[in-house]
Amino acid sequence: MFILTMGLNHHTAPIDIREKLVFKETEEEMALITLLQEKSILENVIISTCNRTEIVAVVDQIHTGRYYLKRFMANWFQMDMEKIEPYLFFHEEKEAVNHLYKVTAGLDSLVLGETQILGQVKHAFEIAKQTGTTGTLLNKLFREVVTFAKKVHHQTKINENAVSVSYAAVEVAKKLYGSLENKKIVLVGAGEMSELALQNLAGSGIADITIINRTKANAEILADQFQAKVGTYEEMNNYLSIADIVLVSTSADEPIIKQKDMQILMSQKSTSMLVIDIGLPRNVEHDCSYIPNFHLYDIDDLAGVVSANSLERQKIVLALENTIETEVQNFFEWEKQLGVVPVIRALREKALEMQEITMTSLENKLPGLTEREYIQIGKHMKSIINQMLKQPISELKEMSVENDAPTSIEHFKRIFGLTELDITLSEKTQEQAETRS
């Protein structure tokens, strides 16, 4: 089994490609199940955010796994494989695990050190686990990377004062207008990005803030926090006609601000308008950028501002490289030891079987034993067995990560009289126990 990651992100693909390859949350379970049915795919998790679409998979062979991952992407999004392929990246085994650690900790994000991706990765794993597309390897891996990312944010404080996309949006507005005093702003969408933007706008002298959202209750909650007004979708163009700045961030699948509407609106408007679209797929039709005085920015346009991350946080990233390498090494040592788990289980079961035989013999030879005495003897015998097995099992685990592991394990099995039948029966017993639980 091999760990293989395939994806595209803000490093490898422009926004006009990324927005075509986003998995809708409502279809994610079906996508996971469909991918699992592909040849070579044994486990999978799909991570799909505004800046990346990545699939982490366990495959039986690397070369067939790569092909079937690409084929799945092409089929799911109904695009030619040749059109997608130039934007895809692949990471195998240690590179794949290293990459996932960095992604989850926010070290590969457009916004270095941001914590939003941690929640997104955790959510992606939970959906895959509930859907039944993860197994032993990915369950262990994702638990480890989530725990690591939480520790990184807590111990290094890399996320403190992180330059966010919403911050960058506000900086672009300041650059265009010089001062935001007395400006009118409209926020379309009432999610986390809008809330962050409002926090960054605090104290800038904005004269008028209007929040528009399909679910009015969500807009009202945000409006109460920032003394803003609430508008409706039906009246959106009326609010835009008097706005200086518009920030758009919704989960809509198609643009909600159309070129034909904006052409009319801007022809009747005497002032310019800055529109910042941080939705993916994009919420504003790209052709709007050709309208005079309509200044349109999308996520990729904000990258230059975001890249102004502090030198101090960059140092933290470099310092974490060695820590991540250690985590990756530990994971693969654990994976190697998986191969001896059935052997250990069979050894324990054989020892317990011998205990049961001995206890039965003891009961027959010493019928005068009380129940309490019988139980105490059984406990002591089990303790002796555990102590006797502790060192051999520890040595077996050490053998499993050495170069000649297969030969050493075979010697171990022969010394303790373990047959393939013993191991097979032990595995079946374990499977039955897991099914019952």
Curated annotation (Swiss-Prot):
Pathway: Porphyrin-containing compound metabolism; protoporphyrin-IX biosynthesis; 5-aminolevulinate from L-glutamyl-tRNA(Glu): step 1/2. The active site is at 50 (nucleophile). Gene3D superfamilies: Glutamyl-tRNA reductase, N-terminal domain (3.30.460.30), NAD(P)-binding Rossmann-like Domain (3.40.50.720). Keywords: NADP, Oxidoreductase, Porphyrin biosynthesis. NADP(+) binds at residues 189-194. PROSITE patterns: GLUTR. It catalyses: (S)-4-amino-5-oxopentanoate + tRNA(Glu) + NADP(+) = L-glutamyl-tRNA(Glu) + NADPH + H(+). Substrate binds at residues 49-52, 109, 114-116, 120. The record marks 99 as: Important for activity. It is an enzyme of class 1 (oxidoreductase). GO terms for molecular function: glutamyl-tRNA reductase activity; NADP binding. CDD domains: NAD_bind_Glutamyl_tRNA_reduct (cd05213). GO terms for biological process: protoporphyrinogen IX biosynthetic process. Its EC number is 1.2.1.70. Catalyzes the NADPH-dependent reduction of glutamyl-tRNA(Glu) to glutamate 1-semialdehyde (GSA). HAMAP family: Glu_tRNA_reductase. Belongs to the glutamyl-tRNA reductase family. During catalysis, the active site Cys acts as a nucleophile attacking the alpha-carbonyl group of tRNA-bound glutamate with the formation of a thioester intermediate between enzyme and glutamate, and the concomitant release of tRNA(Glu). The thioester intermediate is finally reduced by direct hydride transfer from NADPH, to form the product GSA. Homodimer. Possesses an unusual extended V-shaped dimeric structure with each monomer consisting of three distinct domains arranged along a curved 'spinal' alpha-helix. The N-terminal catalytic domain specifically recognizes the glutamate moiety of the substrate. The second domain is the NADPH-binding domain, and the third C-terminal domain is responsible for dimerization. This is Glutamyl-tRNA reductase. It comes from Listeria welshimeri serovar 6b (strain ATCC 35897 / DSM 20650 / CCUG 15529 / CIP 8149 / NCTC 11857 / SLCC 5334 / V8).
